[in-house]
Curated annotation (Swiss-Prot):
It comes from the Eukaryota. HAMAP family: Ribosomal_plastid_cS23. InterPro entries: PSRP-3/Ycf65_sf (IPR038447), Ribosomal_PSRP3/Ycf65 (IPR006924). GO terms for molecular function: structural constituent of ribosome. GO terms for biological process: translation. Part of the 30S ribosomal subunit. The lineage of its organism: Eukaryota, Discoba, Euglenozoa, Euglenida, Spirocuta. This is Small ribosomal subunit protein cS23. Probably a ribosomal protein or a ribosome-associated protein. It comes from Euglena stellata. Its main location: plastid.
Amino acid sequence: MSSFILKFLWLEKSVAVGLDQKIGDRTTPVTEFFFWPQHDAWEEMKNFLEDKSWIDQSEVVILLNQITEVINYWQEKTELQKRDISHLTEKFPNVVFVGFD
């Protein structure tokens, strides 16, 4: 079971990802939100994760793969499709979508 949760802001012009750590029944933010495509959110998260020796390498791979899947999915959608968010939690059950526009 992962001790981390990826949180996404699903926006029309960008998608952002932040990382929280599970502590008991609660979560606490570990990172700020990294935005795509204004910046390279994936690369920024990769650099952050690689600098943290307390995050297991296998966990890093899983988190980066999940980020890749969500960003790729976001990029494939038209602006109209990006507004239809009802299916996101089904498609990506291991992440949390915390904001939309």
